[in-house]
Amino acid sequence: MDFTEIRLSGKTRREHDLLGEMEIPAEYYFGVQTMRAVENFHISHVRLNFFPELIRALADVKQGAAMANRDLGLLDPAIADAIIRACEELRAGKLEEQFVVDMVQGGAGTSTNMNANEVIANRARELLGHEKGEYQFCHPNNHVNLSQSTNDAYPTAVRIALVRSIEKLVASLRELIAAFHAKGEEFSGIIKMGRTQLQDAVPMTLGQEFEAYAANLTEETERLTANMKLFFEINMGATAIGTGINADPDYAGLCTRYLREITGLPLVEASNMIEATSDTGAFIMNSSAQKRLAVKLSKICNDLRLLSSGPRCGLNEINLPPRQPGSSIMPGKVNPVLPEVVNQVAFRVIGNDLTVTIASEAGQLELNVMEPIIVHCLFESIEMLINAMNTLREKCIAGITANEEVCRRMVFNSIGLVTALNPYLGYETSSMLAKEALKTGKGIYDLVLEHKLMSEEELHKVLQPENMVHPRKKIGE
């Protein structure tokens, strides 16, 4: 295997598992089981080390387990201390390059769990003064994985990592919301035409439009934050299927307590370990919340592309910052590339949500072996959403400018002004005016005076666009 970030001396050590022996480069902290996983799974080419939060969470879980096993007299204190120190190094970002298995893997996450077990065991052996591969001093299964199964250690680490990742996602979202609020305030005095079904509707301000985007996204911070709490319930101590085989009766509570201290999260034991080991409901809920955010971001970006269309034959109400030439054949063309890329991220997130749904449905009996693809999709979606929102905020929203005269001219030329006459002239008369304006090209203002339906003074008050962007009492009342 060629991991270019790990320099090799050519020296090797020999390791074995139930399938036989294998030569392992001396610089690798992972061992034979990880090597077999690397050989088997050339799938996504996205390794565990692409998501540092997952490595950090695996270290949390292994440290909590070691502390609980030590306290219960199941693990030699010296070995426990070495494991704890190795985990602390992982949490500090060391040895990330050693987490090399593909995120998409068979085995319900066993390859991920063993990658962590082997790296921690080999580093712990070094801290104890021994060489990598001398498993009698610290064994990946007998010591690092003591009282655990992949089926409780892996999903617990995933949940912890997802909480931290969602916190970053929400922070990025809040910054984007603030950017929309800032533009809403900046554009608060700019009158423009609102549209429904892409047809002229009634006046509004450009600021109201951007404030609506901010409000729309604010709902998602609340939903993501509430949804995140589902991940506080963990199944450490469930071991293989939730019955707790090979775990001390006090292990689950003690390990969960230590994990609360290590992570600072309000983690709790699942009330039914068998249900918690097989259930993926929290993943479905979180994926759905990510999809909902993606859909809203995509809709907003659709609007930005429409509002900036032109510059001479489109709406041209706003200008997006020009970021790169838009065409290899059309000189001078600049495209809305940033909203476009956010659209594409949204499509990917929506697709990932479908994958999570199908993989969750595919669970059988006491375990869902499809969790690796669920985990891959969730972390990929979060990563892409964070990057997309940061890019949109920094390179697009912050630099948007308004074409105020274009916006105002469209309002005064619009037949949509006639809506304001409904309370005074009635729907049928207003409809007649709209039809005549469309046929003759005359303005609504001129036609009302021509037909002597209202005085000029009263008409001016009614059709003043600034008076049409908020609820107000009928003039004269």
Language-model-detected regions and their locations in the chain:
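Conserved, well-structured ligand/cofactor-binding cores
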Residues: 1-477
